[in-house]
Amino acid sequence: MKYDYLIVGAGFSGAVLAERLSSVGKKVLVVEKRNHIGGNCYDFFDKNGVLVHKYGPHYFRTNSDQVVEYLSQFTDWLPQEFKVRAFVKKELYPLPINRDTLNAFFRVNLKTEEEAEKFLEEKKEKIKNPQNAEEQVLSLAGREIYEAFFKNYTIKQWGIHPKNLDASVTARIPIRTNANDCYFNDKFQAMPKEGYTKIFEKMFEKCKVLLETDYREIKNKISYQNIIYTGPIDAFFNYKYGKLPYRSLKIKFENYKKEFYQDWAQINYPNDYKFTRIVEIKHVTKQKIPCTTISKEYPTWEGEPYYPVPNPNNEKIYQKYEREAQKIRNVYFIGRLAQYRYLNMDQVIKNALEFFEEMKK
């Protein structure tokens, strides 16, 4: 069979484009090197019947009506307010930092946003244009908050001192002066009712998917017109400009014969233990079963690529690959790995939908 599109990767970028192209009559072949669809969003029922996220928690949230409308074709939703705590000095504090965090941590009694703003103004360091992740936090919340909540967590998470990471790394986490303890501000926050894998199964219904397959081993054996590549861009070019670093995770799952292990879906451990956080995803999947599974995350440089490492040197390397990519006809690079960008799920989906619209022109 002759395919219009060979799509490399079965995560959200590949799935959206496979579904959209199939819907307009294009013949699509999806090739995935892993033994499952869904990329890092893949979830499954463990031996105890608990729905777990194999590659760490994926909390769905977005401000895009377009993304919600699109995904709602493939799933019903469980509305959520995702809430996270940080374990610091043997106490649990709301994350992101909010007025309650400030009151508890500094033993003060700030009652209004204005009082909290004034308090932070006295704590923060006067840095007009933060140049790195450390300066970003210091400019918003000051040294004490940085040292207690951000510094060691960032070092654990990235294996790099915050001074050597882009300000964007810590800018993702707001500092609030109100008492809002929701982890995200997005207007739509939910979990897919039957999990993420079910979404992908429906999205791939009209196209052929090959699992445990390296596209390089089959691309000369099949006929196709275009490639959509969602894998690591440096791998595509055989690392000719050097390897782009990705942070990965080793995740240890533990099952307990009780309804819940902890009171929150996620507790971060900035300063204690080698793991960064304990996640009990059952809090947000709303399963009603008498046991639970938690995951402990240990950041590492080995394993599946999770997070591009944002700093100026890596950006320079990526730009070299990006220029190479622009020279190739009928090969399209899209997604977190192909674009070497830290993208949330909704951003990946929106980018793929917009890319499809461009392709139709």
What feature does the model see in each segment?
Residues E69-Y70, I145, Q262-W264:
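Structural/interface elements that position substrates and couple domains in central-metabolism enzymes
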Residues G9, E81, V209-D214, G335:
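Short loop/edge segments at beta-strand edges and connector loops
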Residues Y3, G25, C207, S223-Q225, ...:
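Short, well-ordered alpha-helix to beta-strand connector turns
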Residues Y3-V30, F356:
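N-terminal Rossmann-like FAD-binding beta1-loop-alpha1 element of flavoenzymes
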Residues Y224-Q225, A235-M359:
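C-terminal segments that line or cap access tunnels to active or ligand-binding sites in enzymes
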